[in-house]
């Protein structure tokens, strides 16, 4: 006599085999490593160290301070969503040499282009992308600028050139 298989019994036996199957250790380590690396990258992307640059609150107070001190202004146009801006804040503005140079030579203003109060400045300086670094005289006349992410060396060179030609 031939034994017939009952499909309902067979499928439950197969499903219990599937449930008991463990994944290969390689994949466990792969996914764990992937998760750790992803978390580290996410933290690094959003981490901006504190710095000692004394950023002006607004353009009016910055112009008054620049006028009184005889310094030029640094306008840094940024956005909350701007990854190159965060990299500049972390790698350029948090550098001790850069902080010292900024605080001694210019009046810095950080301008978030998404802020409704910055709309007039964004239009005036024709800002279409970020980051943009602009050096101006106290009246707001552009002396030098850079579009996009710049490194410490280029930033310091711009500041040096500004000192040689500026007031």
Model regions and ranges:
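Non-catalytic, surface beta->alpha helical segment in thiol-disulfide oxidoreductase systems
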Residues: 129-167
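A short beta-strand-turn-helix
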Residues: 55-72, 102
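Short pre-active-site segment immediately N-terminal to redox-active cysteine/selenocysteine motifs
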Residues: 70-73, 77-81, 129
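Thiol-based oxidoreductase modules, predominantly thioredoxin-like and allied folds used
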Residues: 55-56, 93-117
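Conserved redox-active cysteine motifs that mediate thiol-disulfide chemistry
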Residues: 77-93
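Active-site-proximal beta-strand/loop segments in catalytic clefts of secreted hydrolases
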Residues: 77-79, 111-114, 138, 148-149
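Hydrophobic beta-strand anchors of alpha/beta hydrolase catalytic cores
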Residues: 74-75, 108, 133
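N-terminal targeting signals for export/organelle localization
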Residues: 1-53, 167
